[in-house]
Amino acid sequence: MSEKIRKTLSLIESQQLAQDVWHILQEQHFKGMLPYFTVEHLCTKHQLTPQQLALKLLPIAAAYSLAPISQFHVGAIAIGQRGAYYFGANLEFASTHIQQTVHAEQSAISHAWMNHESAITDVVVNYTPCGHCRQFMNELKTAPQLKIHLPHSQNNLLHSYLPDAFGPADLDIQHFLLDAQNNQLTYETQDPVMLTALECANAAHAPYSKSYHGIAIETKDKQIYRGSYAENAAFNPSLPALQVALNHLLLSGDTLQNIQRIVMIEKANHLCYRHMAEDLVANLVDIPLDYIAL
């Protein structure tokens, strides 16, 4: 990851800004986020607004992309309510279903979610959001005020891209993606990876199917990455927990080759994600999915 990011630095107009961000990311082992106080410091030093700074950093966000199919690298930055930046990038997985793909806006928002962000105010992206992503972003409580910023056009409300939008309220749902959630699932274990998967299943946003699942990925150096299921009112833009967890791992500067264990805990109701998850795990790593049904 460090080499991919290093190659993008020349795309940032100010080389002083590029070097400042390089040193920050290097110090945090290339975790793809910037705390609000770091954003404030960079904005002050380089005389930029948070939105202007994010636009300049999009090449770095896009460096986290995995696009073996399209070779089309999209970068996004979700800005949290206190001003933190959460990078995101499109993730494609060859030799499996195209539905396993993660879009850059989904990546940035789910990355924010796994870092316990509770509200997104702005999404900055290097290409116009596709319809899939517009619908995904409409699952946020902040959707009516959410601003989209592109290199060629800034300060656009999400609903200017999604007029007469269909969303959670149309299905009488008042609970939104990123809202605190406890699905009250229980499982007796002292295993920290299983406990993390259970915690993620309890945090899943699935008000439509009420089918909850969570993923925990353990690496060879004992890091644990999290993924909760993010359901959508339009169903198809929903994001499975495995993709959320893989995204969390990659945006944390880690690698697929470092994975040694994947645990999935699921309370299936109208839906079951087990086989979809097993297919992607078998495609990516030489380990079985550790699946627990509640």
Curated annotation (Swiss-Prot):
The Gene Ontology biological process terms listed for this entry are:
cytidine deamination
Query: Which residue intervals define the domain CMP/dCMP-type deaminase in the entry?
Result: 49-169, 188-294
Top enzyme class of this protein? hydrolase
**Keyword Signal on this protein?**
no
Q: Any note on cofactor binding? A: Binds 1 zinc ion.
Reactions accelerated catalytically: cytidine + H2O + H(+) = uridine + NH4(+); 2'-deoxycytidine + H2O + H(+) = 2'-deoxyuridine + NH4(+)
InterPro entries per the record?
A: APOBEC/CMP_deaminase_Zn-bd, CMP_dCMP_dom, Cyd/dCyd_deaminase_Zn-bd, Cyt/Deoxycyt_deaminase, Cyt_deam_dimer, Cytidine_deaminase-like, Cytidine_deaminase_bacteria
Q: Where does Zn(2+) bind?
A: 103, 130, 133
Q: In the UniProt entry, which residues are flagged as the active site?
A: 105
**Keywords annotated in UniProt:** Hydrolase, Metal-binding, Zinc
**An MF annotation (GO) of this entry:** cytidine deaminase activity
Tell me the superkingdom of the source: Bacteria
Gene3D superfamilies assigned to the protein according to its UniProt record, in alphabetical order: Cytidine Deaminase, domain 2
EC number in record: 3.5.4.5
**Cofactor or coenzyme needed:** Zn(2+)
- The entry marks the following residues as binding substrate, namely 90-92
- Identify the GO cellular component terms for this protein: cytosol
Q: Which family would the database say this protein is a member of?
A: Belongs to the cytidine and deoxycytidylate deaminase family.
Q: What does this protein do?
A: This enzyme scavenges exogenous and endogenous cytidine and 2'-deoxycytidine for UMP synthesis.
Outline the subunit composition: Homodimer.
Q: What is this protein called?
A: Cytidine deaminase
